Amino acid sequence: MSDSPSLSPPAPSQGPTTPRKGPPKFKQRQTRQFKSKPPKKGVKGFGDDIPGMEGLGTDITVICPWEAFSHLELHELAQFGII
């Protein structure tokens, strides 16, 4: 059996020469700042422009908080933590 080639272990595959890096690490911001200012309370366009209500002015106390932000969408209220 001298004619049979000798079995040798397969050559190790050549991997990357640089060490593997883990996933990128992101720095978390300390404070979260909104790009726009939070909405102000009050119904938009309510007050002196209603016929018969000229003497009342625009300082109207709103009892229901939904009325105070009726000019906004729900996602805008949620963005600023109102709901």
UniProtKB/Swiss-Prot annotation:
Protein's recorded name: Retinal cone rhodopsin-sensitive cGMP 3',5'-cyclic phosphodiesterase subunit gamma
Species of origin: Mus musculus
Record Pfam families: PDE6_gamma
Similarity annotation: Belongs to the rod/cone cGMP-PDE gamma subunit family.
Function according to Swiss-Prot or TrEMBL: Participates in processes of transmission and amplification of the visual signal. cGMP-PDEs are the effector molecules in G-protein-mediated phototransduction in vertebrate rods and cones.
UniProt feature, compositional bias: Basic residues: 22-43
Cysteine pairs bridged by disulfides in the record: none
Protein keywords: cGMP, Hydrolase, Sensory transduction, Vision
Keyword Hydrolase: yes
Catalytic activity: 3',5'-cyclic GMP + H2O = GMP + H(+)
Record note on quaternary structure: Tetramer composed of two catalytic chains (alpha and beta), and two inhibitory chains (gamma).
Keyword Hydrolase assigned: yes
